[in-house]
């Protein structure tokens, strides 16, 4: 039967060309290609980058992640640096973005709104700073070490606000940096943007003319609520908060914009008349704050480059604590007269640079979908991907959650897909790039049988997951053994997933208690095990016998019993025998357990094989009693209280602080709510601090926490 492939759309052709170029620039040494090949590659890069710039800056509908765009732009810059004659007037390296649409009135910026050059690592920041130092030394006639202001790079829509005699007169998008779009009526609907600069006697009258530059953005919680509302009305949700902010500002109907929960941060100024402006960028931010503009509280001024780099490292690790998206840190030479001395190149200032975080999102090809069997028998689809770098690591597999997830997003084998990796979260496929489809993609369905043991898969009522319910499924036991030995359970050093698989598949370990029967000669039979490695593993296994009871409970893999639940159980039951004898009602009555978990625990202990396992572990010397440090705390101000931690504490790590709170009978939560009793605040706190202030929740520093714990 003859098949017909649907013609590709313009978006599909652009994505296909982009994907090919990304593979080329990742695989080829651009320093080694000859001029002819460089000319052809540069032409393709210009064409593709200009199309993406138009979609990003004008349509506010990007097709690819920023990291992919940046990689292609870097490649073009390298080629143009090697062969300067390849630079053309229409090269995206010579301009900020695309031309504005005709739907809004055009506004010419009094001073260009330039973009920023990117720094993709600490070395790039050092190179930028040293270049600034050299240029300033040449122009000042003496060496200088300029201070740097560091600001979070808010992921939103750039905006220029013009005030005349203190009254908002124009709000304009960046557009191409020279001309933007007049979105004044929409900007007036954003509560955070002053319509009139308030007169403050301490500050003096407002400037006769002032251009404030900043970013319109949407908070994560507001974005989630907006998408819920859109989906409830049957409308298409936004892909991310940046798109939501940009799409809301550029609505033709200001009444629609007024209903969108938009926010604003001011980060700089353009032309100013009728006022004295501080010479320091950091002090400009404070001045804008006094004028009534919202300014991000995390901006800092540093005298030393090492402190700047530490700030970048901190926010790379802690950005998820914020209630808004950031995609980097903007670094600026603080002294504004020196900014003027440094000047700008065609599309970016020399005195500023954007330190970009490792990409958390990328587009790659979905090669296949396989299924993985977990320790509880849950069977989940796993995406097999064309390898791509996301979040600083190469990703070749990602989670697809369950069959409903795949079907609801119409993810097909052969699709180009968007992959994200946020923080320590497992990489996941979030959506297909439908515009890139050729017609050759294949839908996927969950197999009927377990890939490990061949048993019929079962979907339980009310659940999205399928399960293998065979008690002798080999794949389940491998995962259970790996979990049992894991860092948060029995913490057996040297026993990762590969060793767990070897021990299970060789028949040396099954059930878990066999782990404590292993002998040196058993391990020496395994591939990769010499005597030293074998003895080290045996020592680690022996040491694990004395782990706290809560770790053993977690390691047993009882469904719904995580680390926190295991700790709660040990507070109530002094031994595993006491826990095994507890009724469902007794278990469900425990705060933080509930009826579903209670039934799961009771059912686990009813299984004869599980009861036999516990007896064997006891006979082999594994601790099954509550240790003194796990005992319930005596009455104290902390017992029963809920704590939330935010920011870096001066002496305690976050894990140490959490352990101290738990030992004293307190609980640690991940987010602030009206049920929170205390918020422990360290350096550079995140949005949890703001939320605590709004709710009037008591806040403690490290010393205050230690005093409450009776340790000071």
From Swiss-Prot:
Example GO molecular function: DNA binding
Cofactor field: Mg(2+); Mn(2+)
Species this chain originates from: Rhodothermus marinus (Rhodothermus obamensis)
Matches recorded under InterPro entries: BRCT_dom (IPR001357), BRCT_dom_sf (IPR036420), DisA/LigA_HHH (IPR041663), DNA_ligase (IPR001679), DNA_ligase_AS (IPR018239), DNA_ligase_CS (IPR033136), DNAligase_adenylation (IPR013839), DNAligase_N (IPR013840)
Key words, A-Z: DNA damage, DNA repair, DNA replication, Ligase, Magnesium, Manganese, Metal-binding, NAD, Zinc
PROSITE patterns, sorted: BRCT (PS50172), DNA_LIGASE_N1 (PS01055), DNA_LIGASE_N2 (PS01056)
This protein's name: DNA ligase
Gene3D superfamilies: 5' to 3' exonuclease, C-terminal subdomain, 6.20.10.30, BRCT domain, DNA ligase/mRNA capping enzyme, Helix hairpin bin, Nucleic acid-binding proteins
Binding site for Zn(2+): 450, 453, 468, 473
Domain of life: Bacteria
